[in-house]
């Protein structure tokens, strides 16, 4: 979602053979619908340039002459060095303006808007641990698409919620209109995880006649429409996503500073208001208790962040375009948390079903839009598919090919 984890996926065994099988060189050029790929949380690179008045450790760089990769750079996640990274990647929330700011002397930018490189591999070294949308893009290329032309990427600053990314949506709309003109037809949006929430926000803010003209379809992969309980654990005690060299408490402050985390807390239109997500020796917390939850974890800014973002997407307002929802099932997915010591110790996790990150009932919110829009809404379960692995899954890629090129 957006995944709230480091993106880690590997090429499937026999993946190259599968790509060759999908290749369709006979498909007439120019008749493919253009494609825009939208990543999830932590799903594209970020770059930073420094001119800081001070640093948190003597090993940290105070000034850089050029932009460098802030995410994902595996070298920056090493012990001690990670303190430098946390200090640079965090956001500072302003209670007066209800916006976030970069730390003093840190400038962060999103590289590669319109290209796919920053989301194919999150680590510019192209290490397998940072592979994200590479297999999907390679599949598109094998079907006749060309990077940076009729398949483009729309990366964004995933630390922020849509209300702080206004210029991004203007650039996205302009790019879609340009691709329509260049390639003679409407665009197919393909989003993953939190990128689906971004696209829902975008589409809810476009006139219907614009959507009818410029958007052919919206393919939503692992969509967290109703929010995910995992965010409560991230906010309370941090989440190292099973990376042993990183302590959860070490990165908790940085994870809390990302407003997009509070945006993805569970919503009442999907989850029962009585469902207990967090149990502690002193209190239990449902989605009606967020204000108290933030107070008890010592993060009062979180309540303001939630109030700022809770109404950004309207659950009862469908996207207004042809929609394909693909979601993982059968993978143990965090649903509630028991703390013996709250909030500074890891909890016992209780699991439901989903894709390991997005719970099934959150993804299935797609179903409620049937009958609320004239455009068709299709749902496709992906049994046993994990949140990231689904992006390279043969079923997913075959489904996408049918959407783009037909039977």
Swiss-Prot record:
Transacylase activity is completely inhibited by Triton X-100 and partially inhibited by heparin. Moderately activated by Mg(2+) and Ca(2+). This is Lysosomal phospholipase A and acyltransferase. Its EC number is 2.3.1.-, 3.1.1.32, 3.1.1.4, 3.1.1.5. The keyword Translocase does not apply. Has dual calcium-independent phospholipase and O-acyltransferase activities with a potential role in glycerophospholipid homeostasis and remodeling of acyl groups of lipophilic alcohols present in acidic cellular compartments. Catalyzes hydrolysis of the ester bond of the fatty acyl group attached at sn-1 or sn-2 position of phospholipids (phospholipase A1 or A2 activity) and transfer it to the hydroxyl group at the first carbon of lipophilic alcohols (O-acyltransferase activity). It is a peripheral membrane protein. Optimum pH is 4.5 for the transacylase activity. Residues 1-29 form the signal peptide. Pfam families: LCAT. Detected in brain (at protein level). GO terms for cellular component: extracellular space; lysosome; membrane. Belongs to the AB hydrolase superfamily. Lipase family. SUPFAM superfamilies: alpha/beta-Hydrolases. The active site is at residues 193, 355, 387. It is found in: Lysosome; Secreted; Membrane. It comes from the Eukaryota. Disulfide bonds join 60-84.
């Amino acid at each position: 979602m957006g995944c709230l984890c480091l993106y880690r996926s590997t090429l499937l065994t026999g993946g190259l053979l599968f790509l060759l099988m999908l290749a369709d060189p006979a498909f007439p050029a120019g008749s493919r619908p253009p494609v825009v790929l939208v990543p999830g949380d932590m799903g594209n690179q970020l770059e930073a340039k420094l001119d800081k008045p001070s640093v948190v450790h003597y090993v940290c760089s105070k000034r850089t002459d050029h932009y460098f990769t802030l995410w994902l750079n595996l070298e920056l996640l090493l012990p001690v060095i990670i303190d430098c990274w946390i200090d640079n990647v965090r956001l500072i929330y302003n209670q007066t303006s209800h916006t976030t700011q970069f730390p003093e002397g840190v400038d962060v930018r999103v590289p590669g808007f319109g290209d796919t490189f920053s989301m194919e591999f999150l680590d510019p070294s192209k290490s397998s641990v940072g592979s994200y949308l590479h297999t999907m893009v390679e599949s598109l290329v094998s079907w006749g698409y060309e990077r940076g032309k009729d398949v483009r990427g729309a990366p964004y600053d995933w630390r922020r919620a849509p209300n702080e990314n206004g210029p991004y949506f203007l650039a996205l709309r302009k790019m879609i209109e340009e691709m329509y003109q260049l390639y003679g037809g409407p665009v197919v949006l393909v989003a993953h995880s939190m990128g689906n929430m971004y696209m829902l926000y975008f589409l809810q803010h476009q006139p219907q006649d614009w959507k009818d003209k410029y958007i052919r379809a919206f393919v939503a992969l692992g969509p967290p429409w109703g929010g995910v309980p995992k965010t409560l654990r991230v906010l309370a005690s941090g989440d190292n996503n099973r990376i042993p060299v990183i302590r959860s408490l070490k990165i908790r402050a940085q994870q809390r500073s990302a407003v997009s985390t509070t945006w993805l807390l569970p919503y009442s239109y999907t989850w029962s208001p009585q469902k207990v997500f967090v149990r502690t020796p002193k209190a239990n917390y449902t989605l009606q208790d967020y204000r108290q939850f933030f107070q008890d974890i010592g993060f009062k800014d979180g309540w303001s962040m939630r109030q700022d973002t809770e109404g950004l997407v309207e659950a009862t307002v469908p996207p207004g375009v042809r929609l394909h929802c693909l979601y993982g099932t059968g993978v143990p997915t965090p649903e509630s948390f028991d703390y013996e010591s709250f909030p500074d110790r890891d909890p016992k996790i209780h699991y439901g079903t989903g894709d390991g990150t997005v719970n099934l009932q959150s993804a299935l919110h797609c179903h409620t839009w049937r009958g609320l829009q004239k455009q068709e809404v299709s749902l496709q379960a992906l049994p046993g598919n994990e949140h990231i692995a689904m992006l390279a899954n043969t079923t997913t890629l075959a489904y996408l090919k049918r959407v783009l090129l037909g039977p």
